[in-house]
Amino acid sequence: MKKVKLKAPAKVNYRLDVLRRRPDGYHDLRMIMQRIDLCDDIEIALSGTRGVRVTCGRDGVPDGPDNIAWRAADALLTISGRAVGLDIAITKNIPVAAGLGGGSSDGATVLMGVNELLGLGFSDERLMEIGVKLGADVPFFIFKKTALAEGIGDKLTAVETISPVWLVLVNPHLHVSTGWVYQNLRLTAMKDDDIIPRFYGKIEDVCAILANDLESVTIGRFPVIQEIKERLLRVGACGSLMSGSGSTVFGLFKDEAAARRAAETLAAESNWFVVAVKTL
């Protein structure tokens, strides 16, 4: 095998509770995380020159060691002791710094792809152990299930939900720094005793749990986030929420036709990035 081609899916957070700040500077979280079929395309090929090379061609996405995909490949080569060359080409379809986990998904997908390409035989559990050192969301994309994520996001429990659910994603072309959002978050009520269901049999069940503690911070700086939430509801979403630290907002719809109609309406009324997607 000389190369592999893979899809790196985005995610949305149906729920994001920030429980407390930890002594190590991270936060304990409780999230419901869901993969969607908006994907980056990744090709990993063996090269005659040792080392890792990443090409992307998207403004704001580094090609070298600052790219999580580069660090993922380098980590596996170091751990496995394999002295080979890898060329990684990433076609970005997921908006950058948008709360959709695009970077983490790229890193996770490269871990799985290099493992396959080189026949390393690492289990998903081992790849998740490696991945969490690259980013807190990386293990989720290796887990490959809708998940309740706890701790810093690395403690994962499978959640049963209806599939597929159709969503409309709207991004107002704003890059939001996750670090800035957490630095400006003011923790208030404790939520440890809140019960989050592990089964969602209909779309109304999902809409009932939509909540994101980071929304108020991001909306305070970018009021357009609130505007997008309201417009999604006006075009028929049963619920709308900012994903992650933003700036992407998603709305849930009863079926594909409703989602596509809403996406067409919002795209015609704005210059935002708008797309209808379904859950995986």
Swiss-Prot record:
Reactions mediated catalytically: 4-CDP-2-C-methyl-D-erythritol + ATP = 4-CDP-2-C-methyl-D-erythritol 2-phosphate + ADP + H(+)
**Entry GO MF terms:** 4-(cytidine 5'-diphospho)-2-C-methyl-D-erythritol kinase activity; ATP binding
Q: What are the UniProt keywords, alphabetically?
A: ATP-binding, Isoprene biosynthesis, Kinase, Nucleotide-binding, Transferase
Q: Its Gene Ontology biological processes? A: isopentenyl diphosphate biosynthetic process, methylerythritol 4-phosphate pathway; terpenoid biosynthetic process
Catalytic residues? Answer: 11, 137
Name the Enzyme Commission number(s) assigned to this protein: 2.7.1.148
Pathway where this protein functions? Isoprenoid biosynthesis; isopentenyl diphosphate biosynthesis via DXP pathway; isopentenyl diphosphate from 1-deoxy-D-xylulose 5-phosphate: step 3/6
EC main class here is transferase
Record-given protein name: 4-diphosphocytidyl-2-C-methyl-D-erythritol kinase
Which organism encodes this protein? Geotalea uraniireducens (strain Rf4) (Geobacter uraniireducens)
